[in-house]
Amino acid sequence: MTSTASVFRPIAPPQIIEGAFTPDQHARMLDVVRRNGPWSLILAQHFKSPEEVIATTSGMVPEGFTPTWDMFLSPVFRGYFAQACTALHPEIEDCFLNTRFLDLVRGYWGAKYATPENMLFNIQGPCQGGGSPHVDATRFSGVSMHNTPIWLMNTMVKTGLFQHWRQKKAQVITWYYKGKVGGGFNYWPEGPQAGPAQIKAPMWGRAVV
């Protein structure tokens, strides 16, 4: 079995980008968000029980303990600009088919080819931070977020048993937050058995690969 540290250690440190989108692109994306809401909670979209949330994060429940939804509820809502390699809103297609981002992803993996798959946004209200670490952007041959529950794919990653079928993916994560309280990005450059690092707020138009 592959060790936990090697499974979760990033292939390279995050690359920080300033001005990820132009002011015009940002304005058009915000317009789509405002015109097409309301947006549902992330929890409602991806999980059917508190146990599935735990499987995605810590993966363990003490014997005799029953988790409840109120343990995980937070004001974090999600919508999609693009899914399954298709832009859902033509007016922001250039934001999705972003050649700058594709170049960064190819460079991150040392790959010849890359294709954009999904583009989503989160709207987050004030809430407690410091939740359990989790895995994003998992995909295996024939298994993706389009046909498989998120909690199951993340469990597959944590076992280390499916590495042969795991596909190479990267994310470009962008923030628009002018505050200085909270809002940072925690990551584990040496895997979960070592300490975390943080990219601190404010983060207006800042992105990481």
Regions found by a protein language model. Name each.
Residues 14-16, 120-122, 207-208:
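Ordered hydrophobic segments in well-structured contexts
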Residues 48-49, 118-126:
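Short, glycine/charge-rich beta-strand/loop segments that flank catalytic centers
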Residues 91, 97-111, 119:
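Hydrophobic alpha-helical segments and helix pairs
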